[in-house]
């Protein structure tokens, strides 16, 4: 099942990617070798026992051709998670400067394509220092495949003590083979993002994924984020691709001393979605807030695997994930907190709650703690259940219809996560997306 992608890589390496610097070509070669050795994961592996990727493994998804869909700025605004503001736009993983808008970014913020950033100069050195250093492509077949086909993506660098006051969006749009571009079958894109926020800087970044059409397509994304000493970052990730889309993602973050990362994950789209999220608190005093919400219906399947690695003492992490599952949807959550030897005075909390709106909906929740230090405060828990009948009765007794009462209770459950998101302007926009997903 890996052979077609090895052949595609050989063509990619000799044609479209031939102009890459030697260090990047070396990484790609190593990544395709690891993908070949690892193969696609199966349900026999513990980390994948609730999620089958057979629909991906048994289909040959090809790279999109050179033909591009015709999009206008108003189309992009409609597909954006924010609607307005500075943004980098990518179609099938390739940068589209004509659809992007970077006006108003302060001095000290560089936002461009990875293809441009890796070529030369200070940006090239930054990319070389960080790119493919954090995402686990040696151990993950999907991260390895993304790294092998690494040609373009988003590069955002916020210099030390710089304040990026307004949110910067990185928008990845996926086509769907024949439905949009005339390509001869289902296509795959490998979006890549590298976010570097230096010492003492402040930034809000939104990474959003949407489909241009509803045909069969696969997005295989990798994001690496570095949060420097004393920096503060709010990173929102919004996935609302089409119902015939497969979405596999790896999000890897590294935090330095006294840094803060608020990572907010919203999963609404895709037929099959898997998101591996790992954050390493690698400096004393680092703080992580990880919020997640998945709203699923039909036969959607979404699997979130999170790892919070407390590698240094006096760090804090608070993780809250809620899932709303209707019809035959299946939600999977696996949350792992690791407290390394010597990481004393760790403060960590993890909660996963799932709301089942039908008897056919299903949720599997596995919170885990691995503690190798003795002076820590760590808790975890999960719930799976139907609507709160007491709350429904209360609303019905005040004259609300059964449908309205259910809608209010369901929205209130989702709003628990939305309310934890820091920026009111972003929260308001995401609230609209969630309400539409619940309708």
Predicted regions, residues:
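Generic hydrophobic-segment detector
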Residues: 21, 29, 34-37, 83, ...
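Short, low-to-moderate order helix/coil transition modules at the start of elongated helical scaffolds
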Residues: 1-222, 229-232
